[in-house]
Amino acid sequence: MKQLVVFTLGVLVSICNAAEHQPKTEVGVSVHKVGESFEVKASYLVPMDICNAFAFITDYEDARNIKGIAESKIISRTDNKVIVERKAKETVLLFPLEINTTLEYTEMPNRGLNFEQIHGDNKTYKGTWRLEPQGSSTKFVYQSVIEVNSMVPKTVLEYFMKNTIKKRFEAMAARATLKAHAPNPKCA
């Protein structure tokens, strides 16, 4: 029994040391309120080639693995246009917030994509993802304009946008870094 405890502690110490030495992806995020809308800009660099980066941002259904995204499913795909239904659930300072949206993505292989809400709870939601090769890594660059249509007080929404969005992008960057270790078969 004592050997099992010592072995388990050794494994836990090894895991903690490995996690400590894992390079942390730096994520830059800015959120600015402009009138009734929010402008969001974010970027992060991941040790992943451009093909795998594009496969990552176009894996729409994998978005369910990001905290706050309850559902994400492809409704249709035609050429470079993809329609995705997405449901996000958050609690913002004790206010439950659920946002349903249908997005149209226009893919530009290995360069990025544009997206726009075509139906949903937001008054406006549109933006872009751009991929910038940097050596053996790729920089993910996101920009969007969001005007939320909600009963949640505006000050609470502003708090959410400025304090929670960064965590969401950090989770995306961590997921991309994890996926970088298991390349997409389409890119082999």
Task: Write out the residue ranges for each language-model feature.
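Hydrophobic pocket/interface hotspot
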Residues: 52-54, 63, 105, 131, ...
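Hydrophobic ligand-binding cavity/cleft-lining segments
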Residues: 18-81, 139
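Short, well-ordered alpha-helical segments
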Residues: 52-61, 160-168, 172
